[in-house]
Swiss-Prot record:
It comes from the Eukaryota. Belongs to the tryptophan dimethylallyltransferase family. It comes from Aspergillus versicolor. This is Deoxybrevianamide E synthase. The record marks 112 as: Required for regioselectivity. Residues 1-28 are annotated as: Disordered.
Amino acid sequence: MTAPELRAPAGHPQEPPARSSPAQALSSYHHFPTSDQERWYQETGSLCSRFLEAGQYGLHQQYQFMFFFMHHLIPALGPYPQKWRSTISRSGLPIEFSLNFQKGSHRLLRIGFEPVNFLSGSSQDPFNRIPIADLLAQLARLQLRGFDTQCFQQLLTRFQLSLDEVRQLPPDDQPLKSQGAFGFDFNPDGAILVKGYVFPYLKAKAAGVPVATLIAESVRAIDADRNQFMHAFSLINDYMQESTGYNEYTFLSCDLVEMSRQRVKIYGAHTEVTWAKIAEMWTLGGRLIEEPEIMEGLARLKQIWSLLQIGEGSRAFKGGFDYGKASATDQIPSPIIWNYEISPGSSFPVPKFYLPVHGENDLRVARSLAQFWDSLGWSEHACAYPDMLQQLYPDLDVSRTSRLQSWISYSYTAKKGVYMSVYFHSQSTYLWEED
């Protein structure tokens, strides 16, 4: 197939649409109880609405999801301007929008989210424990389809700091303080799938045990009744022990569904951003090279890696944030992030890589993605994406920005083929100077 001609989108403010967006319409009939909520909605509401439109949701679903966003997420963003720096985004923003792309499939909006309140980071709650429990209880009252907290509650119990441990750890010595977070998948049928994330490093440090030990014991505990994860997990654990893959950036996630449908993911970050290291991690140090699915996925990953032209080398990243002029220059380049997904009864994990494009020219990244998608036969996504990126940020010129897209995630299975997501800067204000 011939690659589509990719022109530079217009980089100037566009005329407002003739009809109100769902974000505008809903806010016309809603009184925000605090100025903080009103300001957060100004920063994120219209942007969320544009992501829903880019995700090709029907108008009914757009209103439904915007209502959820307005009433359950906006109140949990905490004080404005933000004081708490969240682990979930490069700028420390406690919210992150992403769009998922597959061949012939509806684009799907996901929101990564760490709830925050006015106590977050204070002496009363230096590691932001309280809002996690509060939002979890609130979600349980909504009667979301298939919602089950059992696995996530077990992980929180094992990984969250106790009050005594909170008192032991000096918060100023910890660059990454988050204890937990959520992910919300907005499905085309109107269902919301919730994911939970836990960050074990602080617990391991307070308890005086290695991160690897804490994670292995926790996976065994949640799998004790069903024994559906341990075979694949043992492959991951052996490789990560061998390669020093466990570190302060290692974290876990699970779906908030009942245990028979549960998936567990082990995440990590590495500052060696090279193709050789990616290939090693993708194959678990060679343990999976006999699996055709793994090797086919690696070959296609090499294609997008080459197109993105990410500079290879060791990054100086130490857990810092990039939130404007005050950011340390050596903390702007991101590490590479990966996860290994374990499904019930799987013989090996499915790897996923998050290629770091924070700091790369946004239009060039968009064109590289479009070129790759066109090579896969994803003509609809390929033709639409560069203009879509500009429409998401109508007040910016995406040919002059370099922080709107933070990560490009990639995974591959024989059943579904290539599966990709783009993670975005998730507030209207652009915190950096344009190039």
